[in-house]
């Protein structure tokens, strides 16, 4: 069954030279792949099989996605905010405060069909100057947020994770997956989505000694996630159905 998803077993190296390759995001109307090279403080792009810089400096952007108008939506460690980049590469701040306090360092992000923006906020970008700017946490904890760009309303979705990291909806948006990459927790969890809330947190997989970082859902509801030496695939029943070993770690 798993092999039926794979059209090829060939790896194609798109680019070599990033310190960390994070947040790959495809922008359909541009036929362009964008990703972050976080410690190098830049973003890269792939167009017509050619790689070049998309933005430098990027203010230490990390996770990326697109909104429903195919604008690029990015988490910025350096800005401690969420950015929107339009077709002309104009960058604007979407949201940068929680109750008047700076975010920690928004890490990963997804956009729902109702235009709401969901993102995780661990402190990795403020722990040192390596992937952001060393700074202090201004609120206690590491939350998962939901921002409505139409009403400008920001809501906390959960406070119950140690270091929330990767985040993605299932294809039907009935489930929300969130990775926790805390010191003693390297797990992927799934929540049921009920209106504007998430409930019924369940464990999908414990990845120790590795962890699940970025992931996305396919149209069949399978979750494809980075996980140490492999890309692992879980079906909608949270069962591991296969993995692809990668040649580089």
Residue ranges and their predicted role:
Residues 46-50, 86-90, 148-152, 192-196, ...:
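Short loop/turn segments that connect beta-strands within beta-propeller blades
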Residues 42-44, 81-83, 143-145, 187-189, ...:
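A short loop-to-beta-strand structural motif that recurs across blades of beta-propeller domains
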Residues 184-192, 197-239:
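Loop/turn-rich, solvent-exposed surfaces of beta-rich toroidal or solenoidal domains
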Residues 38-39, 77-78, 126-141, 181-186:
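Short, solvent-exposed loop/turn segments at conserved positions within beta-propeller repeat blades
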Residues 16-31, 57-76, 80-81, 99-117, ...:
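Beta-rich, blade/repeat-based domains predominating
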Residues 1-19, 46-49, 201-203:
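A short helix->beta-strand "capping" segment at the edge of beta-propeller domains
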Residues 12-13, 52-57, 92-96, 155-158, ...:
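Beta-propeller fold detector
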Residues 1-12, 29, 40, 138-141:
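Blade/loop signatures of beta-propeller domains
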């Amino acid at each position: 069954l798993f092999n039926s998803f794979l059209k090829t077993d060939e790896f194609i190296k798109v680019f070599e030279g990033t310190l960390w390759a994070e947040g790959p995001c495809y922008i359909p109307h541009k036929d362009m792949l964008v990703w972050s090279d976080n410690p190098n403080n830049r973003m890269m792009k792939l167009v017509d099989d050619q790689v070049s810089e998309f933005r430098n400096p990027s203010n230490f952007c990390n996770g990326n996605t697109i909104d429903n108008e195919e604008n690029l939506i990015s988490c910025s460690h350096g800005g401690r905010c969420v950015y929107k980049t339009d077709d002309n590469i104009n960058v604007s701040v979407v949201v940068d405060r929680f109750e008047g306090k700076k975010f920690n360092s928004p890490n990963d992000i997804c956009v729902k069909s109702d235009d709401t923006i969901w993102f995780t906020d661990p402190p990795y970008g403020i722990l040192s100057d390596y992937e952001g700017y060393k700074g202090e946490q201004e609120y206690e904890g590491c939350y998962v947020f939901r921002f409505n760009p139409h009403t400008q309303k920001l809501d906390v979705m959960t406070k119950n994770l140690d270091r929330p990291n990767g985040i993605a909806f299932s294809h039907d948006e009935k489930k929300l997956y969130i990775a926790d990459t805390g010191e003693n927790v390297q797990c992927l969890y799934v929540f049921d989505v009920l209106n504007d809330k998430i409930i019924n947190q369940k464990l999908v997989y414990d990845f120790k000694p590795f962890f699940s970082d970025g992931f996305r859902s396919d149209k069949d509801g399978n979750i494809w996630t980075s996980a140490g030496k492999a890309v692992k695939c879980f079906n909608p029943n949270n069962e591991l159905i296969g993995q692809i070993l990668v040649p580089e770690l």
